[in-house]
Amino acid sequence: MDGVSNWPAPSTPTPVHATLTIPGSKSQTNRALVLAALATPQGTSTISGALRSRDTDLMIGALQTLGFDVESAGTDSDLRVGGGLGPAAGARVDCGLAGTVLRFLPPVAALSTETVEFDGDEQARARPIAPLLAGLQALGVRIDGDGLPFRVRGEGSVAGGTVEIDASASSQFVSGLMLSGALFRDGLTIVHTGESVPSAPHVAMTVSMLRDAGVEVDDTKTNRWTVRPGPVAARHWTIEPDLSNAVPFLSAGVVSGGAVRITGWPAVSTQPAGAIMAILEKVGAVVRQTESYLEVQGTRQYQGFDVDLHDVGELTPAVAALAAVATPGAVSRLRGVAHLRGHETDRLAALSAEINGLGGQCEETDDGLVITAAPLHGGVWHSYADHRMAMAGAIVGLRTPGVEIEDIATTAKTLPEFPQMWADMLAGQTATDPEAGA
């Protein structure tokens, strides 16, 4: 990538021992921001522990474009949301590469009385959005286009009712419609018609947060969600640490045979905490959870594993990195993630290319990857402007001297502090590993 320097990924021959605090959850932050905006007729909402990253700043900017007031309340991670829906004529929402902005805000714009244009990064134009737009059109919303850039022609209200959509490409189609559904005149019933919805825990998170905002949601029937019409309550939101962003750091404990502790790990969460712990246990790690932290103690040598990541697809790059540096010859199978071909990049093709480019053995399957661990060598690990690809490269680099991450700054999408946090974690560790890959 022109103008982008490579980041030398640190490697270490000694166990990593560290205690870290991870910034707030992107998924919770952006849902709380949308719900706080929709609650403005009832009053001002506040958010504490909000993540500040490119994705959340894009959401803040987009809500401001739609007329809402979003401002810091003492610190960058404490926010106040007020004002009201009222975009100016010619308003344009910049989605960047944020799927939550792309999919959560068209239904909000449909409630306005203006035409709002949506556009984003060039890569975002390849991200799936047509099923959501078709769903809105079926509900009577006027939309020009079926992908970025597109225009939502707001008419001040949305009738609501029942809509059928195929959300097999992204659970955000369901979440995006549900978040605004209570403000549709007749509420909203969503019927999913395709194959299984990926990342189902994120839909459950949306349902939980809607209920926390006083919205009545019925999700008792499989592939059917009903949101009753009514106000969204103004309230205070407390954001948990981003557990997905904790995984690369926990993985450092695994691949180095060390121990990494994450403080503030929630005892109960709508994030996929249980899935993360189960995956780490599959690679032989000892996982210990208390009321105040999660600690993972790893073993530098571990065997392959078989894991279905359909519900936690965002973990795939980190899990693939763990598989790539397992005991040479160990075979791992990652399944259920065909939908990753439509994420920030085609993550399956990208992971295969990068692991193989460093001497590994990675093959794509219809719905995932088969990785046979092999001694790796140094080289450039391309990020594809994908934050999770960059983080995965850092995991590989811990065991492989000479790995350079192209565009480490792309981690700013969800964790701007990543390079410094990674360095802090490794403070005092030897920077080279002459026996890496052995």
UniProtKB/Swiss-Prot annotation:
Monomer. It catalyses: 3-phosphoshikimate + phosphoenolpyruvate = 5-O-(1-carboxyvinyl)-3-phosphoshikimate + phosphate. The keyword Iron does not apply. Its main location: cytoplasm. The active site is at E314 (proton acceptor). Keywords: Amino-acid biosynthesis, Aromatic amino acid biosynthesis, Cytoplasm, Transferase. Catalyzes the transfer of the enolpyruvyl moiety of phosphoenolpyruvate (PEP) to the 5-hydroxyl of shikimate-3-phosphate (S3P) to produce enolpyruvyl shikimate-3-phosphate and inorganic phosphate. It holds the Pfam family EPSP_synthase. Its EC number is 2.5.1.19. Pathway: Metabolic intermediate biosynthesis; chorismate biosynthesis; chorismate from D-erythrose 4-phosphate and phosphoenolpyruvate: step 6/7. It comes from the Bacteria. It is found in: Cytoplasm. GO terms for molecular function: 3-phosphoshikimate 1-carboxyvinyltransferase activity. 3-phosphoshikimate binds at K26, S27, R31, S170, S171, Q172, S199, E314, H343. This is 3-phosphoshikimate 1-carboxyvinyltransferase.
